[in-house]
């Protein structure tokens, strides 16, 4: 699962008098506690970091310097450190920018850092931690992980769902073809809309066996319902681990100071509006005996039985897990496809090389299929390079320590939230030559037998989560990403719009996606008979 995009600015400002009184109170408390017992300091030091205020820690500094991820990265550069300790409330947040230290956490000490933090947003989106990805370490997490490994991501199940994925890949090509085939010079299309629709619809198809919640569009594109649903899912991802003030000072939650809770609940209501009627109807069909064979993942979850022949999953577990599965694929594929095309338009020789690979491996008489994906090393390298240079979020999902530990010579207290910096790992000049240059060849040069694996096991950057909390669907996720990019590159010739002479590479300051959607000139490059009707 992908990390939320960023850590957002609050839109709610507390009264000035209350803020002033609070600041004065903090000064007094800090003065009184300045002479605390030095013997309480552990022999092994904490990682370097700012001096925290009593009770609130460094929350005031974070609040003043939003977005939080840029403040954290700036602070680490100021401290000249690859690991820091920032206390927010009573929680120690441990950001890491070095692959060596990252490996100490998630490889050498993986068992200790196998939990997740409790946040307002993740508790809401998981219906009280009934799911896998965001749930804290424990029996419920183990139960749901067993279900997904055995029933959703095993090779036979992934193959069983191939036809549904093919339908969505064909629909993507149909949608773009309908937009650009009428004119011999093609047409300008919004790449983000197409890629985002595919990213949402492919899991929707596998879970609910439907592309649309409503009627959709005649050209194959998303309708109002699909756009609303995807937007709500992206909102949930955005706020899942967004440094919400009340996650560190729970007694402030009633005030919703940064406005996160209102947005999360609104987004969750939208998701439920579209999904729950389908789930409820399907549950009733199984109970009434109208269904007895699975047709999609929703059916699979409903049909599972425990040792006593009773339903293995409750209705609420099914609803929560189907939501989390959609969250896992809705952001990363479209982010990779959009940034890859942006970079390749800036270096047209890369477009040519990708097209040549597709023509050599697939040809022009058929559309690229999942069976071709392992034989497309250059396109896989392009996707991997986007993961390095343009990550979907600034940090990975937080790992929480379930016991005190010593890592890289520092004391890491129980309950610490460890976050690996996707930005700084992927752009680290000590690891990557010309780190800000988009260069897919760097991954081909180190690949064994030209097999480019999108998973980065050495944590030189973060692609998929790893270790005990690692992504269960790495293979499927990699295939979805490469298929999206390959279908875009094989089906259409891409160029800058007629009135544009320069690519805009501006990165959103709050999110990490491209600040503005990619608009590009698309023109069919295959015989008309190949395109789905």
Swiss-Prot record:
This is Tryptophan N-monooxygenase CYP79A68. It is an enzyme of class 1 (oxidoreductase). The keyword DNA-binding does not apply. GO terms for molecular function: heme binding; iron ion binding; tryptophan N-monooxygenase activity. Confined to buds. The lineage of its organism: Eukaryota, Viridiplantae, Streptophyta, Embryophyta, Tracheophyta. Its cofactor is heme. GO terms for cellular component: membrane. It comes from Prunus mume.
């Amino acid at each position: 699962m992908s990390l939320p995009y960023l850590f957002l600015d609050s839109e709610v400002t507390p009264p000035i008098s209350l803020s002033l009184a609070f600041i004065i109170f903090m000064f007094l408390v800090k003065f009184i506690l300045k002479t605390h017992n030095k013997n309480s300091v552990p022999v092994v030091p904490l990682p370097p970091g700012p001096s925290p205020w009593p009770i609130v820690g460094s929350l005031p500094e974070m609040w003043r310097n939003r977005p939080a991820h840029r403040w954290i990265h700036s602070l680490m550069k100021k401290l000249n450190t690859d690991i820091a300790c920032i206390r927010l409330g009573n929680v120690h947040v441990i950001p890491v920018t070095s692959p060596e230290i990252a490996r100490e956490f998630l490889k050498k000490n993986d068992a200790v850092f196998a939990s997740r933090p409790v946040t307002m947003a993740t508790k809401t989106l998981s219906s009280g931690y009934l799911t896998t990805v965001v749930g804290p370490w424990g029996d419920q997490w183990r139960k749901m992980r067993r279900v997904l490994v055995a029933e959703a991501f095993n090779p036979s199940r992934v193959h069983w769902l191939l036809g549904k994925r093919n339908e969505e890949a064909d629909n993507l090509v149909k949608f773009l073809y309908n937009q650009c085939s009428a004119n011999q010079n093609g047409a300008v299309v919004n790449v983000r809309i197409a890629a985002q629709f595919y990213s949402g619809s492919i899991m929707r198809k596998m879970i609910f066996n439907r592309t649309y919640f409503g009627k959709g569009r005649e050209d194959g594109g998303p309708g109002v319902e699909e756009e609303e649903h995807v937007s709500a899912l992206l909102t949930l991802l955005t706020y899942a681990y967004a440094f919400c003030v009340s996650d560190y000072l729970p007694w402030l939650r009633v005030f919703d100071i940064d406005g996160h809770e209102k947005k999360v609940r609104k987004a969750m209501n939208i998701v439920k509006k579209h999904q729950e009627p389908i789930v409820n109807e399907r549950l009733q069909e199984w109970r009434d005996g109208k269904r007895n064979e699975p047709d999609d993942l929703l059916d699979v979850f409903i049909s599972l039985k425990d040792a006593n022949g009773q339903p293995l999953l409750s209705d609420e577990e099914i609803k929560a897990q189907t939501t989390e599965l959609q969250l896992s694929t809705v952001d990363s594929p479209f982010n990779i496809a959009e940034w890859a095309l942006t970079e390749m338009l800036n270096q047209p020789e890369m477009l040519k090389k990708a097209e040549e690979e597709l023509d050599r491996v697939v040809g022009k008489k058929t559309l690229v299929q999942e069976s071709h994906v392992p034989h497309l090393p250059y396109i896989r390298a392009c996707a991997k390079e986007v993961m390095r240079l343009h990550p979907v979020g600034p940090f990975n999902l937080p790992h929480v320590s379930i016991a005190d530990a010593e890592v890289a010579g520092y004391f890491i207290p129980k309950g610490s939230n460890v976050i690996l910096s996707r930005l700084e790992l992927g752009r680290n000049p000590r690891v990557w030559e010309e780190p800000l240059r988009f260069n897919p060849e760097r991954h081909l040069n180190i690949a064994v037998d030209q097999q480019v694996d999108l998973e980065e096991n050495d944590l030189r950057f973060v692609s998929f989560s790893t270790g005990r909390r690692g992504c269960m669907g790495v293979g499927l996720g990699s295939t979805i990403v490469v298929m999206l990019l390959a279908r875009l590159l094989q089906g259409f010739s891409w160029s800058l719009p007629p009135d544009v002479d320069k690519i805009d590479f501006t990165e959103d300051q709050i999110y990490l996606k491209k600040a503005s959607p990619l608009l590009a000139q698309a023109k069919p490059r295959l015989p008309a008979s190949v395109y789905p009707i």
